[in-house]
């Protein structure tokens, strides 16, 4: 028996073809099981070349379906089974590597299906044959520019992210190759795609790579991307005439990634960086922040919606004009800019009237919850700031408390309050959608007034605040306090801030006994009737099973 695969008992190496093998149902399982005779057949250079051709060469449209779909898929799966001798045959042969990377040539068709298979094979080589692959790429620097040219294909983008080390998986054994990538100016090639292409997919993927560089790349690349000159290059492309708005949106995404202090960094990568440099994680320097602030005035001009004439019909009326993704991204950028605690940034935002402008947008677009989320973060950052001028600016010049009280009195759409969000004629104006955010901002004001005399004094001077707080806000908080509900959150969580966006569910210490008790109490009424329907029986069964497992968890935790 040649291979222990059904249907192959009569086969022999002399008369058996690769296509016959790829047509077998259990070929992948046998590969993973390291079937000796099968592996010895596939490791041959002739067979590896045929497998590669299935992956990199487009199939004629009139070919059989299995040639178009099955054979390329199986060929890719054979490579990513990570059989060492097969991968060794590939990486140690220059002609085979040339065939693999011929997929990237400009005159070659680049279908997304085969691009996905190509990407999987190359990433597998990066993981299992790192040094030979990097030596090959370093000897053929045109591969990097070809990858950048195809950056609009997501699978090619993933290859490029791995290649420059901007991924959680670190290749500590080729730090010198990372330096070589910096020397050929790979980051400059990527950022120039913002100028040379009008494709939104290209812009999104270019930004994805640059954001990954800010999180995981080696120090040389991370230092370059956070430099004032590189940030200036980003904004230059963003403000070029006739460039699509996607350039601005994704350029700001890169800046946000540089500024965001909460970006994820794994422990393994922290250890890797400590071996390469003696510094801490590279973040945006004060000079880089100042470079961003130089473009802030131009960004704020784009927030002006008064000259826009486009209209978006909605179910409740119309938006005249709609806010747009680019304006939303600018507001997010301002939010992150305030979160870094830069006094220079805070003063510049005050001078340009940026905070007042975004608060106006908050009320003018009452159903844009993405906008409300970012503006709420901006307001909270200002109120929690240690700079009294910033707090005074929000309370006095932006008239935050007055705006809140006015919105509460006029909770339906109106031209005076929501200038660009209009209700349809003949229909009852709907209730505005930012009441929940207003409630959270008001509660934050009350919380901070206990420790901040400026906020406390401002609230005391506003006669309408005390009345609204006593008659409306207090009752609303009592109704919305889910900790008091029978089926609400466990009592052990009452000391936590309600609806905290920054709270990680993995960090919560749930009171398992309270969960079981509440669940039991919620389901114990009205379920003993003989005429109960099947749905109720299902929920009863589900509740009892849940209680059982909660009790088991409780026993395991405290036993």
Walk through the language-model features, giving the residues of each.
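Long, repeat-rich segments with strong aromatic
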Residues: 312-374, 386
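Amphipathic alpha-helical interface segments used for dimerization/assembly
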Residues: 122, 255, 334, 362, ...
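Elongated alpha-helical scaffolds that mediate protein-protein interactions in large eukaryotic proteins
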Residues: 1-232, 243-249, 256-273, 285, ...
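P-loop NTPase catalytic cores that bind/hydrolyze ATP
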Residues: 246-253, 328-332
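Extended repeat-based solenoid scaffolds, especially LRR ectodomains
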Residues: 264-340
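Acidic, Ser/Thr- and Gly/Pro-rich intrinsically disordered linkers and low-complexity segments
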Residues: 53-70, 299-322, 409-430
């Amino acid at each position: 028996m040649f291979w222990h695969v059904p249907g192959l008992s009569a086969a022999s190496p002399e008369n058996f073809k690769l296509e016959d093998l790829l047509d077998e149902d259990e070929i992948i399982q046998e590969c993973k099981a390291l079937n000796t005779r099968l592996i010895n057949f596939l490791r041959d250079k002739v067979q590896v070349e045929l497998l590669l051709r299935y992956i990199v060469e487009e199939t004629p449209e009139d070919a059989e379906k299995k040639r178009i779909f099955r054979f390329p898929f199986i060929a890719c799966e054979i490579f990513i089974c990570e059989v060492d001798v097969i991968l060794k045959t590939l990486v140690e042969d220059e002609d085979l590597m040339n065939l693999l990377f011929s997929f990237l040539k400009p005159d070659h068709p680049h279908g997304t299906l085969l691009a996905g298979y190509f990407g999987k094979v190359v990433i597998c080589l990066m993981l299992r044959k790192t040094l030979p692959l990097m030596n090959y790429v370093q000897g053929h620097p045109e591969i990097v520019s070809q990858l950048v040219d195809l950056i609009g294909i997501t699978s090619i983008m993933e290859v490029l992210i791995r290649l420059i080390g901007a991924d959680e998986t670190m290749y500590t054994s080729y730090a010198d190759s990372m330096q070589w990538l910096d020397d050929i100016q790979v980051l400059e090639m990527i950022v120039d795609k913002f100028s040379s292409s009008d494709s939104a997919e290209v812009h999104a993927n270019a930004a994805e790579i640059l954001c990954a560089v800010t999180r995981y790349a080696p120090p040389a690349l991370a230092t370059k991307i956070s430099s004032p000159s590189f940030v200036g290059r980003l904004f230059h492309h963003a403000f070029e005439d006739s460039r699509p708005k996607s350039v601005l949106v994704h350029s700001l995404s890169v800046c946000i990634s540089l500024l965001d202090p909460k970006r994820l960094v794994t422990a393994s990568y922290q250890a890797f960086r400590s071996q390469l440099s003696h510094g801490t994680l590279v973040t945006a320097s004060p000079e880089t922040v100042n470079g961003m602030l130089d473009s802030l005035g131009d960004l704020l001009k784009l927030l002006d919606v008064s000259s826009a004439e486009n209209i978006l019909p909605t179910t409740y009326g119309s938006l005249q004009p709609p806010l747009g993704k680019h304006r939303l991204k600018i507001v997010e950028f301002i939010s992150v800019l305030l979160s870094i605690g830069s006094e220079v940034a805070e003063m510049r935002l005050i001078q340009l009237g940026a905070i007042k402008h975004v608060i106006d947008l908050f009320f003018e677009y009452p159903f844009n919850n993405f906008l409300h989320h970012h503006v709420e973060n901006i307001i909270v950052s200002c109120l929690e700031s240690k700079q009294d001028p910033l707090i005074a600016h929000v309370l006095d010049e932006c008239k935050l408390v007055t705006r809140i009280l006015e919105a509460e009195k006029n909770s339906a759409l109106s031209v005076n309050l929501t200038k660009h969000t209009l209700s349809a004629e003949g229909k009852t104006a709907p209730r505005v959608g930012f009441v929940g955010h207003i409630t959270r901002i008001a509660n934050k004001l009350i919380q901070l007034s206990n420790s901040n005399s400026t906020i406390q004094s401002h609230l005391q001077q506003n006669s309408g605040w005390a009345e609204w707080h006593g008659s409306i806000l207090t009752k609303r908080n009592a109704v919305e306090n889910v900790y008091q509900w029978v089926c609400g959150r466990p009592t052990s969580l009452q000391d936590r801030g309600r609806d905290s966006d920054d709270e990680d569910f993995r960090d919560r210490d749930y009171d398992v006994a309270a969960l079981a008790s509440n669940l039991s109490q919620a389901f114990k009424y009205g379920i003993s009737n003989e005429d109960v329907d099947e749905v109720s029986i299902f929920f009863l069964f589900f509740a009892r099973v849940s209680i059982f497992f909660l009790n088991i968890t409780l026993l395991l935790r405290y036993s």
